[in-house]
């Protein structure tokens, strides 16, 4: 399965919407997208995972590294997730204690 990403700017928030699978086979694409977002100067970044069907441990590790890089730049990171399977995985791994999770982009950009 492929991974696609689309970036939008909503006020001072950059929203990166993903669809497909975040797994070992799509890590290079995920890494490229996140690296580009790190290079640019953002106040807040939202990763919209609503279109994601699979999220594995290597992809989770990449997201954690991305969160650490953004924290060093004083950029906040948020995740949008409504898929029961993906959200449950994020909570089981305690990612929600590191990166805030919301159910919609508008909840974050208010």
Which stretches of residues belong to each language-model region?
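Amphipathic alpha-helical interaction surfaces in cytosolic regulatory modules
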Residues: 24-98
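STAS-typified acidic loop motif
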Residues: 3-32, 49-51
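Short acidic-hydrophobic, aromatic-tinged amphipathic segments that line or gate anion-handling sites
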Residues: 99-104
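Short alpha-helical segment
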Residues: 107-108
